[in-house]
A protein has these predicted regions:
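Glycine-/charge-enriched secondary-structure boundary and capping motifs
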Residues: 57-65, 172-187, 203-210, 262, ...
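Acidic, glycine-rich loop-and-beta core segments that form the ion-binding/anion-interacting portion
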Residues: 231-271, 275
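Serine residues within intrinsically disordered or low-complexity segments
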Residues: 13, 19-20, 28, 40, ...
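Short, low-complexity intrinsically disordered segments enriched in A/P/G/S/L with frequent Arg
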Residues: 9, 18-20, 33-35, 40-41
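Glycine-rich phosphate/pyrophosphate-binding loop regions near the starts of catalytic domains
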Residues: 10, 77-241
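N-terminal amphipathic/basic leader segments beginning at the initiator methionine
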Residues: 57-88
Length: 399
């Protein structure tokens, strides 16, 4: 132990202190300046530092910046939230090295196929930190993952979260997990595991980041690949709650530039700017299940996230098909009009960055439009007929 300390202190002294102006000269007891061996002085200082460390007592993990007790408290506080998400297929409880989920309930499927997705909330986490509001950002993390796997037709089974933080504040961590649990309840996924990683020195104490991982199941024969898409199919858009979880770097830049306060109330928003921006991402899982239960076969689905319409709608298309979206077929939400106005953002850039009021776009056969719209409304969501599929080069046209 002594050798390790001396070696490390000596290394630090030589590298950090030997070049310091402090050791260019030092005075003898008679007051005259004498040139010294800089490395020798540094080594002597190392010994003094060693004595100081030994006198101060032994080091532990908490002194290094990681509070294990805070971690235990976080787990205790989040247990009640996690319990709300449990499904019969979950095996075991909280605290193990892994989460287990039985697949025996899916024996009726010819070929059960797992579908996975991982995502985060982007820089929307920064907004939550600024507003000191942490109970909804977890919904965003779940939504970003389960909406993605729902585009393949999968039913979400379970979810895992990862929280990185500069310092573990148990109440804040539990608040974040309460949002994750709420997102799991909305999507039907069980929260079977997670990690809270305390990163002293890597992240500021008051900052954190959040990511998630979702796994779902579908019978392989029902997997959505876009191959069933046909010219003549109708595009149905499902309303978003607002900005959702993409484009927040641009959002922050706009309102930093205009020096807008998040507490500013806007009549057109019906709330403050901050509350409009932090509105959690809508989870479409139950509405999509309702459509399936109505006997409708969706031909393709697109989750409108980063990249807006221009990047995401083509992802659901097969070669030889082209999507046409009519911009006046649904109302653009006021938050996007405000963003465009305040930031002087061109319309094409808006549609290439944000969801513009539609968080999910579906393609169905013309004869299934009415049943699809009814099933969506049944779950409290708002649908719009927004366009069509034509024959042509793979891509999207907004008209």
């Amino acid at each position: 132990m002594y050798r390790w300390l001396v070696g490390n202190l000596r290394l630090w002294s030589v590298q950090e202190l030997v070049s310091s102006e402090l050791f260019d000269n030092h005075k003898s007891i008679h007051g005259e300046a004498v040139t010294t061996n800089r490395e020798s002085v540094a080594i002597h200082l190392s010994i003094y530092l060693l004595v100081y460390v030994l006198a101060a007592g032994t080091m532990d993990y908490k002194n290094a910046g990681v509070d294990i007790e805070a971690g235990y408290k976080s787990v205790e506080l989040m247990k009640k939230h996690i319990a709300k998400t449990m499904r019969p297929e979950v095996l075991g409880g909280i605290g193990g090295f892994s989460g287990a989920f039985s697949m025996s309930a899916f024996k009726n499927m010819e070929e059960p196929t797992l579908v996975s997705g991982t995502d985060g909330c982007g820089t929307k986490v920064k907004l939550a930190m600024i507003m000191d509001k942490h109970d909804t950002i977890g919904i965003d993390a779940v939504a970003m993952c389960v909406n993605d796997i729902a585009c393949a037709g999968a039913e979400p089974l379970f979810f895992l979260d990862y929280i990185a933080c500069g310092k573990n504040y148990p109440e804040k961590i539990a608040e974040i997990v309460s949002g994750v649990a709420e997102g799991c309840v909305q999507s039907g996924a069980a929260l079977i595991g997670g990690e809270t990683a305390e990163h002293p020195g890597l992240m500021p104490e008051d900052e954190h980041d959040l990511a998630g991982f979702a796994v779902g199941v579908i019978d392989k024969q029902d997997l959505l690949t876009g191959e069933e898409l046909n010219p003549g199919d109708v595009l149905i858009g499902m309303a978003s709650t607002g900005v959702h979880s993409n484009g927040f770097s641009l959002v922050r830049k706009v309102f930093e530039m205009t020096r807008e306060s998040l507490d500013t109330y806007y009549d057109e928003l019906g709330t403050t700017l901050g509350e409009a921006l932090i509105a959690p991402t809508r989870i479409y899982v139950k509405a999509l299940k309702s459509i399936r239960d109505a006997g409708v076969r969706i031909h393709a689905r697109s989750h409108i996230t980063g990249g807006g319409f221009y990047e995401n709608i083509p992802r659901m298309l097969k070669e030889g098909t082209h999507a046409v979206v009519e911009r006046d077929s649904y109302p653009v939400l006021p938050i996007f009009k405000l963003l465009a106005k305040k930031g002087n953002i061109e319309e094409k850039m808006m549609y290439n960055t944000f969801n513009m009021g539609l968080g999910m776009v579906l393609a169905v056969a013309p004869e299934d439009v009415d049943k699809t719209m009814e099933a969506i409304r049944k779950e409290g969501d708002t649908p719009y007929v927004v366009g069509r599929i034509e024959a042509g080069e793979k891509g999207v046209t907004l008209c």
